[in-house]
Amino acid sequence: MYIGRFLVVGKTQQGKPFVSYRVSSRSFPNRKAVINNTNDTVAILPNDLNDMFANPYIAYNCIKIVGNTVIATNGTHTDIIADKIKLELPIRDALALSLIAMDYEKDDYNTPRIAVVLNENTAYMGYVADNDIRIKEVPLKDGLAYYLSTYECCRISTEHQNIVVDGENPEEICKFVMDYEKFEKPVCCATATIDGDIELGTL
């Protein structure tokens, strides 16, 4: 099944909070996830930078760390949400203001913007589509995670969209998410785990 770009948020079997973001793409598969020099941001970049002239939505920061909080999204709203978190807005408010302001992507598919904000004790998922907007706190339970995608599964459901993720560090979780055969067209992945410190990994 093709569900496009998606986020996975939850806890590992050993109780570490994590969030993963996977790019799945039919149109622009030649992309990579790159961690910046200060180890607090992951960017999605095309292998050929000229591709950015063909589509403005294919390059963006997908993960950003602000203090003890991780912001993960499928677009440039990562930075907008992160700025609100820096200003110490509550997570719900930071998500709501940012998603309303940015709105869905104005591409051929009206692609929804999806987002997760995570810290050691709290996880929120949110999205804005052309006909819907929602923000919801989701429970963090050891060994359980939830996914939210741009297509087919753009809804927040802890009952029907849950997944047991294998892995304890960012690289292992990235590999699991990339290899997850139920969802087609994997391109690249980025993961943040919280275990005292926040660690980043890509694949």
From Swiss-Prot:
It comes from the Archaea. Keywords: Hydrolase, Purine biosynthesis. It catalyses: IMP + H2O = 5-formamido-1-(5-phospho-D-ribosyl)imidazole-4-carboxamide. InterPro entries: IMP_cyclohydrolase, IMP_cyclohydrolase-like, IMP_cyclohydrolase-like_sf. Pfam families: IMP_cyclohyd. Pathway: Purine metabolism; IMP biosynthesis via de novo pathway; IMP from 5-formamido-1-(5-phospho-D-ribosyl)imidazole-4-carboxamide: step 1/1. Catalyzes the cyclization of 5-formylamidoimidazole-4-carboxamide ribonucleotide to IMP. This is IMP cyclohydrolase. It comes from Methanococcus aeolicus (strain ATCC BAA-1280 / DSM 17508 / OCM 812 / Nankai-3).
